[in-house]
UniProtKB/Swiss-Prot annotation:
Pfam families: Glyco_hydro_11
Disulfide bond keyword on record: no
Record-annotated active site: E142 (nucleophile), E237 (proton donor), E409 (nucleophile), E501 (proton donor)
Signal sequence interval, chain numbering: 1-25
Keywords recorded for this protein, A-Z: Carbohydrate metabolism, Cellulose degradation, Glycosidase, Hydrolase, Polysaccharide degradation, Repeat, Signal, Xylan degradation
Domain GH11: from-to ranges: 40-250, 316-514
Organism of provenance: Fibrobacter succinogenes (strain ATCC 19169 / S85)
Designated name of the protein: Endo-1,4-beta-xylanase C
Catalysed conversion reaction: Endohydrolysis of (1->4)-beta-D-xylosidic linkages in xylans
Composition bias type Low complexity, residue spans: 263-294, 527-539
Biological processes annotated in GO: cellulose catabolic process; xylan catabolic process
Family assignment from sequence similarity: Belongs to the glycosyl hydrolase 11 (cellulase G) family.
Amino acid sequence: MKTFSVTKSSVVFAMALGMASTAFAQDFCSNAQHSGQKVTITSNQTGKIGDIGYELWDENGHGGSATFYSDGSMDCNITGAKDYLCRAGLSLGSNKTYKELGGDMIAEFKLVKSGAQNVGYSYIGIYGWMEGVSGTPSQLVEYYVIDNTLANDMPGSWIGNERKGTITVDGGTYTVYRNTRTGPAIKNSGNVTFYQYFSVRTSPRDCGTINISEHMRQWEKMGLTMGKLYEAKVLGEAGNVNGEVRGGHMDFPHAKVYVKNGSDPVSSSSVKSSSSTDAPKSSSSKGNGNVSGKIDACKDVMGHEGKETRTQGQNNSSVTGNVGSSPYHYEIWYQGGNNSMTFYDNGTYKASWNGTNDFLARVGFKYDEKHTYEELGPIDAYYKWSKQGSAGGYNYIGIYGWTVDPLVEYYIVDDWFNKPGANLLGQRKGEFTVDGDTYEIWQNTRVQQPSIKGTQTFPQYFSVRKSARSCGHIDITAHMKKWEELGMKMGKMYEAKVLVEAGGGSGSFDVTYFKMTDKAHPLAQPEPESSSSEAKVESSSSTVALHAAPKMELKSGNFQVFDMQGRFLGTVKLDAGASVAQVLKANFKNAGIYMVKQGNFMQRVAVK
């Protein structure tokens, strides 16, 4: 029998590690305080501070305020609201079910509350939405795990149409209800009908840990269907259907939601958020302009990098191909004139035209016509460009692509030489707000015109931004969802690319920052160096094992990059004289802790 020796020092170390971890878990109940950057909100708004998604919403739009901190904590004040919600945590983007996150969703909270007047109902705990829930009205579910309240008593049987039973989670007993509600919901204008799921704790508590995933497992056993998670946030809510709540205060000096992989908690930065689709719970369709991850295309510097390839295209014919070893694809197409396109390995490109009847140049994702945008997404673009000259009678700058089955040509127009009008766009279908501005939505019909499938009759879909811009983020998926809500059917994706199109004139276009992401090519999300969850990771056994691994002496050449959850981010090249941190910063933009691997050795690298 093979035996293993264990030294006394290793046993002592393991015991100390376990005790430290336990102490940390209990510490926030007695020693919690707000820390980090903060933002104070006084009207309905969603946003991000650090890697924390937050929202303040009340039915009046002016019935309170909230201060959100970059450590996840928040301070919520009600001055006079019919229904008030204050929440912070994970914005998940409706991409995965709770089973697909790679671990359990865990919430920690510490609550300090003061009494409010005229409280009809109040829910303090966990809150979120799910999309794509089969068998439910509008495929939406609003869910709650309620651990406390501003009211005199915890919610009772009045909260739901259906009592499903009781469960025991995190040392407490919860009663589970399902309710059918018609009212405001995410991503909808006006009222819609949806289900609500509730876990209501029998005895309220003002501090503790909530295993959100365990509640969802128990809900499923009771026949409640789960969907794709839109969010999971610590919540303070209070309202009254017959008046206003006045004077309530819910302070959360500690609040955190993370995904726990095995024994290692993962901060909210490890889950890709939905960027601008994080619309507020209200009767308005207006969203916000937040960008997933930490990319700021307007400030970050990229420039033209890698091999330069120039093509003059071919009259009345598409010239296409891959952009170096990147995941991107290019295309140039025109009718007449003297035109060209120059593209670079990082996806940036230049284009020029002179005397053309119609000119298109574009770079982005080329798909196989087998999957919908929902299956491929979320799809996002980050860009910075400049333009000169003129572009004739019509022109579009933004996102462009096609779908098949049905055949559709689509545009998201963020910029122009001359703003396109109704004569080019067809029938106005509506408007919505995303990425910080309102877009008007139009549908046109092209009769027997050139297409990716030859000469065809097909619809064109347009989202046209009210104010032009030359840099920022475009949530492509949000536009497509809105089009379908308006009856504009999308098919299987052929492409999604950053485009310049000119209907004449003489001009040039230069994209100096370019990045696109989708499910297959997500935005890198390393764990923040300064987060409190990093302190926990430092004390975890798996991180100790990494520290115990032989440290490598980094040499010039290629090495692989991983985030702290072991997800592969890409391969980068280290040139002689450069530091690894500099190379990581240049390639991934985000500050944080990375793991780099060269040969059989791995090493942690901090990027500030």
